Amino acid sequence: YSEKFKYVLVDEYQDTNKAQFTLITLLSARYGNITVVGDNDQGIYSFRGADISNILNFERDFPGTKIIKLEQNYRCTGNILNAANAVIKNNTVKYKKELWTQNEVGELPNVFCGDNEYDEGSYIVEQINRLRREEYFKYQDFTVLYRMNAQSRAIEDILRRENIAYKIVGGLKFYERKEIKD
């Protein structure tokens, strides 16, 4: 079956599991033309079965591999990358790399650790209101990003309590979801 696939490309390889590794190995067996893109420092899906050893053992599993490290970051400021490098250096098993940028140093990151999701929601709204007062922003100038839709409830509850209009892009507001309305 691998005859059908002259080239195999896998994105987010750090998030692959054992079954996907086996499939990738079988599909690329005939021609050996395999390209993967991934970052061992972004492997966060072990709870879903992802196996970080897939990317860490890539050179061993696919002999003749050439690793190209993309260490220059075009989006973040220097201070954001300094914080990222400080966290990444604690990874015990990894490919060695040092992220860098030609961008400005930028502001220092602000870290808030709330006791729960409602503390986080309150903090977000407090910061929005502070910036509106001090910097004269409008509500429409703000965007709140979250990783999972389940995180929206606490933020939405606080926004509703404070009578702040908002919209959800790419989904439904928590209280408009079918399973909540029923």
Q: Predicted regions span which residues?
A:
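Glycine-/small-residue-rich beta-strand-loop submotif within the FAD-binding core of flavoenzymes
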Residues: 60
